[in-house]
Structures are given as structure tokens and as C-alpha cells.
């Protein structure tokens, strides 16, 4: 997705272990998260002492190779975030209810100038369980991103241990490559 030295943005990142994995491969990580406690735990687990500064209405936790913005992701601006080479959406789109997803997809485009994305979604019978994570069908991924990105499904697999007590859950991994011109 992005090589060493690339800056990867993880929206609604929480304290995912993927951050340490990316940093271990030389990526610079930027993230956004609503839960301050999760970010404090993340930095403790990474054994990093962040510098905490204001970024508009957000707090910015920074250390070598990592910047995490705490607060409402919709308050994050391109000026706060800075340049991004790629987006890794592991659990953000599926965390949002349907009425917010279109706004979110547009916000990511405006934040990053349409950086390429790796997106992970789940599909299941939404009537059987409330989200989050919410079920996001393949046609919705195409509707949200197809006008601005070439949408390619890389892999589809059943979630082995299910999700939310459901046994029939499918995980889809998508690559979104910006359409240029």
C-alpha cells in the first residue's frame, strides 16, 4: 500500500496494533480518534512520550513518526493533517451509521487530496445485529467511492469467529485508486 517513508492516515484509529506494524516498516503514521484514553494507551504501548498541542478544536499527540488527532474527525482539516500518501481504513467506515458514511467518504477525499486507500468492510444481515460495526455492502462501497476512485476488491473471506454473535459475516478488502483527470 505504501512504502517506507510514506505517510499513512488511519481514520478512527483507536489503539490498533496496525500502527506499530506500519511504523515498524518505516511508514509515518497519522491518525484521528475520538477517544483520548485510547490514544494515551496507544502511546504508552508504543513507549513514546507524545507532545500534546492544540490543532483547532482537536488535540494533536505527536512523537517521532506519528501524529494522532483527538476529537471529531470532521473537524480535522488538510492544514492540520498535512500531506498523506495513503489511507488505511481498518474500522472507520464500518463504525459509522449509513447516514454519515457519504459525508465521511467525501471528507477523506478533501483531507487527503484523494490519496489511495485500503478499506476493510464487513457484510452481514444488519437486521440481526445493531452496529457498530455496521454492515457495508459492496454496492455501497462502489456508490461512495466509484466516482473518484477505481474500486477493486482484493479479497473476500468469511470472518472465522463471526462478529457480534453472528456466524455469517464476510470481510472484504478493497483497494481504492484515485481517478486522475
Per-segment meaning from a language model:
Residues 1-6, 15-19, 31-66, 70-80, ...:
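Class I (Rossmann-like) S-adenosyl-L-methionine-dependent methyltransferase catalytic domain
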Amino acid at each position: 500500500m505504501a512504502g517506507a517513508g510514506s505517510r499513512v492516515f488511519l481514520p478512527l484509529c483507536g489503539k490498533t496494533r496496525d500502527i506499530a506494524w506500519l511504523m515498524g516498516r518505516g511508514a509515518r503514521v497519522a491518525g484521528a480518534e475520538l477517544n483520548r484514553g485510547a490514544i494515551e494507551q496507544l502511546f504508552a504501548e508504543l513507549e513514546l512520550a507524545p507532545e500534546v498541542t492544540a490543532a483547532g478544536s482537536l488535540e494533536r499527540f505527536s512523537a517521532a513518526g506519528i501524529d494522532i488527532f483527538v476529537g471529531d474527525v470532521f473537524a480535522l482539516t488538510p492544514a492540520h493533517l498535512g500531506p498523506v500518501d495513503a489511507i488505511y481504513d481498518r474500522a472507520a467506515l464500518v463504525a459509522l451509521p449509513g447516514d454519515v458514511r457519504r459525508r465521511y467518504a467525501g471528507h477523506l477525499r478533501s483531507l487527503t487530496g484523494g490519496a489511495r486507500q485500503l478499506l476493510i468492510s464487513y457484510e452481514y444481515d444488519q437486521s440481526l445485529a445493531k452496529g457498530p460495526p455496521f454492515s457495508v455492502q459492496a454496492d455501497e462501497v462502489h456508490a461512495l467511492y466509484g466516482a473518484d476512485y477505481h474500486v477493486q476488491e482484493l479479497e473476500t473471506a468469511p470472518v472465522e469467529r463471526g462478529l457480534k454473535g453472528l456466524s455469517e459475516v464476510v470481510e472484504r478488502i478493497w483497494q481504492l485508486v484515485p481517478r486522475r483527470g
